Amino acid sequence: MRKVSISILFMLVSLTWGTTWLAMRIAVETIPPVFATGMRFMFAAPFLIIIAWLRKKTLLFPPGQRLFQFVICIFYFCIPFSLMIYGETYVNSGLAAIIFANMPVAVLIASVLFLNEKAKLMQIAGLTIAITALTGILLEETNTSTESHWQGITALISAVLIHAIIYTQCKKRSCTVSVITFNALPCLLAGLILSATGWFFERPQVSTFSVHSILATLYLGAFAGVFGILCYFALQQKANAFQASLVFLIFPLIAVSLEDYIYGYAISTHSMLLIIPLVIGIFLTLVARNLPVTSRCRDNSSQK
């Protein structure tokens, strides 16, 4: 029964992570990126706060870490999630998912730089293979696709790096709050900040918002932002760290397949072939590390 529940959770998380990239693309078709991200968090926050109330979880971090809670609001929610959806105005959702699948590699680099962790030989090999393969994919796609631009790629890579740095800071500060506490209040505050910022600077025309874009934003917030978090947290509790981390190898394939099926757009054959060494590199990084790629302070990465 435990294996069945792990398998179901793994599939749910993979599908959630894989579909969110397509949802972000649909959302920004008619809604400006910053305002769309604010809407996303505003949809998610009430559910998270209700769950916190039902489970009797505090909304505030422990004394001494409350300033860090605000840092998480800005540098975990506001900036990187805005960069993700902004990136998708220049990059197709499949390529965006492939870039974000390199989170384990970014976490390894950040851990070495900020936590003084020593990288194993296999980790270095995996990192080298993954970065080389990703570079090849990015060069191939920017040369062959009119939908892939360095402006979007830079935004997405920046989001990955910021999330990786926040992960290391959570670990360094021994941030052990529950997944609900970590997400609820920062999500609400981020929603308010981004909605206000988007309203004043992007000047969104609500009358032009399509039903598909609104539903996609609702999906990102209410489903991926709540259900996805809880499923990934449950997966981490039931499976070992390595098993849970394998989601990073699966969700990009789902994103690429969905975009091809719905939009008829597929990455080039060369890029598809380069996914093989990319997956191998990420796999080696995960195997060698044999530690959670995410922690309780990183569960919200399932909102991508």
UniProtKB/Swiss-Prot annotation:
SUPFAM superfamilies: Multidrug resistance efflux transporter EmrE. Residues 15-139, 161-287 form the EamA domain. InterPro entries: AA-Vitamin_Transporters, EamA_dom. Coiled coil: none annotated. The keyword Glycosyltransferase does not apply. It is a multi-pass membrane protein. One of its GO terms (cellular component) is plasma membrane. Keywords: Cell membrane, Membrane, Repeat, Transmembrane, Transmembrane helix. Belongs to the EamA transporter family. This is Protein PagO. It comes from Salmonella typhimurium (strain LT2 / SGSC1412 / ATCC 700720).
